[in-house]
Every structure is written in structure tokens, then in C-alpha cells.
Amino acid sequence: MIMQFLVKAHDGENMLEKRMAVRPRHLEGMANLGKHIVCAGGLLDDEGKMKGSVLVLEFPDRAALDEYLNNEPYVVEGVWEKIVVENMNVVIMNGEKVR
């Protein structure tokens, strides 16, 4: 069975420069995740600068998600300071029922 997870990750203080330096490796890793990604994007502050990330991911279980997170460049490099993970069930996407 495939499980869906909502991952909300907040950057640490003053991490924008480091985030941007690590971003190419983050995006490469995301590209390698392929169909594990339901959707993903950056959280923005009031000035439109990135301050975190939101991802909806599919994995067989929480252990597989944790394995991904333990190797995620933003985690390894200390960009993400606080990560909240919740189980999720996407029902509607782009206005269409998917489950």
C-alpha cells in the first residue's frame, strides 16, 4: 500500500543564501524521486523570498519517507530547521477527484 505524507519544512534563520547554494542538489534529488512526488513547492515570506518547503510525497511507509529525508540536501546541510510530517490522503487535485 502506498501512503501519502504532507511534509512542511521551515528554514532556519537567515538561511536564504545557503538554501540557494544547496538548491541545485535539492532539485536534483527531487527529480530523482519521480513519481514519489505528488506536489512540491517553496514557502514564501511577505517579500516573496523562500523560507521553507511543502511537499506531498508518496512512499510505501514512514520508514521510506524518513530514509529520503535523512538524505535530503536541505536536511543534511542544515537549511531546514523544523520539519512537520503528517499522513495525508489527496482526494482532489487540479479540480479533479483522484481517489
Regions found by a protein language model. Name each.
Residues 1-99:
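Conserved, structured core segments of small domains
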